[in-house]
Each structure stands twice: as structure tokens, then as C-alpha cells.
């Protein structure tokens, strides 16, 4: 039974690889398929010989997956984050946080299954004491019932629900962790309206007086921005973050009419020109750090990935608090020199006084103003630009 189970796992891995490469022929994929077929043809081999062949086959799969990971195109990464086997927010809640309780909507904020809200806890030690630090977790859920959750496309009232609980977190003075898993907001203009609600979220998030840390896996257009304006932006290494989907960009580029289809080659070209990968976004300054994933993207059984993600979100939250709170130079040096794998080695209290909250809002304003300056070409005369900078 153990051998059969491992063979099924290899078959699933091969199918996953074929899915993310979009049916493209590849010598490495062909070799994996061939060797798996050869193993299946030796079903009557002695158990000892089969076990040895299976170990060799698993080693081959691991080696070739690493090679294939280096060959991924931007569109391949898009297919990775859209794959139903991709990690989802519920997987993260189960494996990154020590405890959580999902929260529904209320009053005029009707429940939108694609927007998941949870009160979660990070358990840390301070000497002999065990301290549970609360966090408000907000994000799009596209797995665990994809049709029911509309593929992560949030309706306006779902984004309104997210904003409501951001304000709750601000009232309770607890940090917010947002997880972006959306191809884009659902295009419905019923009240309060998709664009209007996204704008409302952005306006309110800019003034939140608690730290916000976001993790981006699939960041599609305005749907990502509805919960993505944060003090620290982390991005998964196989994710994408773009102003428009590659298919949408290709449709505009080709000027297609209703009923027509865009060629796959044009979609691939648009995905490359959009600069949507984690490396592209880090280079352009739209994110702060890339969180490494296993080869060919993180899936629910990659428990080491969840451990690394926990370290990164805890470290990012600590850095936001330490960056605005009053603390001694020695403590700052200790915090900056902590080992990369030991983010929880030094306890940081997640509380801010009013002066620190003011500094937090100001730093967030400066962060996004700088980002806007690099993305917008100012055509005003140099004198007007200098005067504007002096006033700010």
C-alpha cells in the first residue's frame, strides 16, 4: 500500500507540472512521464526492486522539478497561483497561526464567502510566560470550495466587510495581517459599487492607527488594492501582482471583439511585458520582501513553507512596531541582528501609544507617496516641483 500511495503522489506531481506548463512540450516533462510509465510497466517486479526503483524515480522528480522551476515564465507563474492545488488562506490559518476563529458579516455587511475574516493568535514566550498576541487576519479565500467562493473575486460588500473589521482591529489596537489571493474584484456596480468601495478602503487604510502587514500571492488589479495598502508588503516568490491580468492586457492589445479569442503567444508576451513577478515588483519597489516557496510553488503539504511564512509575518510585524515605538538603541541593534530563522527569539509587545500611532500613519503616507513619485511622471516645471517638495 505504501508503494501505491507514493506512485499516486508522483502521478499527481506530474499532472500538476503539466497543468502549470499549459500543455507545452518539454524534454524534462517528457522524461518524467516516460520514467513513470516504465515503473508502471514493472508492476510484477519483486518488492525490494520496486522500492529501489521508486526511490530513484522520486529523486529524479525532485531534480527535474528544480530544473523546471528555473525555466518558469511569467505566465507559468500565473497558472501556478490559479491552480486549485495552490495554498489558500485557510491553509495558512491552519498552519501559520496557533489558533483562530472565523468571523462573519453583520448588519448591512452581508456575508461574502470570498472574503475571509478571522481573529487569530500568535503564541510567543517571554521568559516563563506564554503570551497569545491577537491579530486580525483578512484575505480572499479562493480554495476549499472554489465555486462557492467565486474564485476569490470579492463583491463590493465583501470589501466593505473587510474594511469594517479593519476598523474593529483599530479600535482594539491589534495588528492586521492581510492575504491577497484574488484575480480581481467582481465587476458589479450594485451599491456600494466595486470601484467606489475599493477607493473607500484605500482612503481608510491610509489612516489606520495599527500596523498592517500584507502577503501577496495573486494580486489582480483593484481587488488586490482593496486590502493591500500596508506598512510592509511581502510577496510569495511564485506569485504575481499586476494592474491587469495577462489575458485582459492581451485582449486590449489585440483589440478583439466579442466572441473572439486571443492567441496564447500574445498572452505570454503580455505577461512578460507587464513585469508581474515577485522579482519584478521587488525591483520596482512595489513590495518590500520576497518569501521563498518550494520548487514550482507552495502547496498544502509543504509544512516547512508555512513555518517560514510564520517567521516572515512575525518579523515584519515586529519591525513595524519597533520602527515607530520609542526604544533604546541597544534593543534596536539586537532586533536588527536577530538570526533570520529566529524571528520569535525576542519578544516584542504589539502595542502603540498615541505618539507612535501618529508616526506610523506618517511613515505609511511617506511610503506610498514615494511609490507614487516613481510611478508618475511629473510634467510640472522644476521650480514648481521644488516648491512642492519644500512644502511637504
Regions found by a protein language model. Name each.
Residues 50-53, 158-160, 262-263:
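Short, motif-level signal for alpha-helix interfacial/capping segments enriched in acidic residues
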